[in-house]
Amino acid sequence: MLQNIPAGEALVNPLTAVVGNGYVAVGEADCRTFADMGLVREGNLIRVCFPASPEGWTVEGELLSPWRAAIVADDLNGLVNSDLLTNLCPASDPSRNFDWVKPGRVLWQWWSSEAPKFEEQQVWYDAAARLGWEYYLIDDGWRFWKEGDKDQWQCLKEVIDYGKSKGVQSVIWVDSKEMRTRAEIHDYLAKVKEAGAVGIKIDFIPAPTPEIMRWYQDALEETYDLQLLCNFHGCVKPSGLRRTWPHELTREAVRGHEFHISRYDRVMPMNQEAIKPFTRLLAGPADFTPTAFVPSELLGYTWPHELAQAIVYTSPLTHFADSYKWYLNSPVEDLLRDMPVVWDETIVLPFSEIGRVAGFVRRHGNEYWIGVVNGEDARTVSFDLGFLQGRALATVISDRPEADDALVREEKIVDRGETITVSLRKGGGYVMRLRSID
């Protein structure tokens, strides 16, 4: 109900509402030169606002306004599968070649142990190679590397070269304050490219005024010219422009595992886990950084829930949060090794309820992966396998009743149309991998 929204408080969009027997999500698309749009309740109305530029702004020359759009759907499956916000953005320039853009899984050190140390990098690349993952992210801290006469750039090139020798490419974290102008963007990213990186994670971006929204476009053009994959962090929400710039594989603009972290005394409310797939994810991929297994960071969630996050929260460049120590030799190492990050088909399971439970079927080629994340209340859900073509080998990961940092694993044969019933703990989850055998 509108009355549950605090009056005068700016809301990030898409904003999703249940209307009658259907759903409406309100958002914006193709925002390049306007300030980012917020929404605010005034009485019984929802109005547009501009939190970053409340006094307005002056435009000289051409004015390019974004689209204000409403996605209307009969059910959550129709809502999630809408391409409206993306299709309202211009297609990529046909003269531009994006064949070099490669999605993949990313190992990452900062969440589990903060600033990466120069002398520790080889073991992380070794672990990424053992997992069969495509990338390793060198996060904040590399700027202070030094060894003998080598400065940070020489140290960076050394570890990137080591990663290449193991078949693992590198994505590099940078602070946006290093490149505020177009010339600074080019010069700084040229150094990153020269060091051998194939991608960039740009952090601490200022509030989304019209000037900063134009800065995003400059960054996208420069990363394209240098053939660097792009991930914006600490940033504005997406507005569908991945259609224009396919090398922007993901961006943050979401409360993911960097919010849910004990060293900052922050815990993700469980209902939010089942809200974001039907709000923020409608605008584009989210760098949620899923799948923490270390027991001290579960904070009420379960291992199956954490694994399911990587299926429910889509990101063509998926940075897995935890240390490799919790992935290698885990009961689901094979699933982590094989899990796709791009999908050919998505089905929202009918038992899904915004804020309570989210269940997704994702197809990649001939395989189906099912992920379920549960909210604050234990529940039992059922779904059928009518999407299968015949029989399949199912690998099932479910909650263990007595422990968060554990799971139940089962291998079985299932058939098309079979009904599956799942008991979910509070903060629990469920994963099923299906491989055709007919």
Protein language model features and the residues they cover:
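Solvent-exposed beta-strand/loop surfaces of large extracellular or lumenal domains
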Residues: V396-G417
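N-terminal accessory beta-strand-rich subdomains and adjacent acidic, glycine-rich linkers
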Residues: M1-C89
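An acidic-aromatic substrate-binding cleft motif
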Residues: L63-Y135
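Glycan-recognition and catalytic regions of carbohydrate-active enzymes
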Residues: D322-W369, E402-A406
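Conserved, mostly hydrophobic/aromatic
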Residues: A128, D203, C230, V312, ...
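Aromatic- and carboxylate-enriched substrate-binding clefts and catalytic-loop regions
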Residues: D139-T302
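Carbohydrate-binding surface patches
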Residues: E353-G390, Y430-R433
